[in-house]
Amino acid sequence: MRDTFQLPLFPLQTVLFPGGVLPLRIFEVRYLDLIQRCQKEGAPFGVVCLTQGSEVRQAPATGDTAAAELFHPIGTLAHIELYERPQPGLMLIRCRGGRRFRLLRSEQMKHGLWTGEAEYLADDPVVPVPPDLVPVRVGLQRLLQHMQAQAQPGDELPIQPPLQWDDCGWVAHRWCDILPVSPQLKQQFLAVDNPLIRLELVGDLLARLKIGTGPEAGPA
């Protein structure tokens, strides 16, 4: 039998990768309740990328029913690391991406919140970055060094410790966090099971986008 679990879902127009940082500004009632419950219980929620619909519920032009929301079946657990309530009806949170999962079924509740039954996808094995992909790693190190040099006090960088420079999966995920490409393309990367292949695909994308990589750089 499959080892499945239930989880609340947060459909977004973005893709969260394992180890990635996701800041969110929450003001919809359905998600205020969700986040408050997750924070209280120390439980994660599932981030899934929308294929149709909006992050904020909107009624269609004809009728009073909220516009349909559709999303990819592969998502990532989001663990709340920072939780603030600066005013009533507003939450500011920062999440960290956890394990990937595949939805087996999902259901929208009466108040608009989505829940799903899911199974975990296998965690990436730690695969060292091979010599031919070292420039991809070096490019990311240089980019982080540039971000650190430009950062102002209080700025939060999109790449956070622990830094795992010799891990194909981690390097690929951090590039995917920051690359200016569509959520649909990022979703394809998320679904790749082999971390070495994922990093190779990222390297091919960097070459097409003419984003610089290089053979020489020290660790950030």
Pin down the residues of each PLM region.
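N-terminal low-complexity, acidic/polar interaction/targeting segments
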Residues: M1-A220
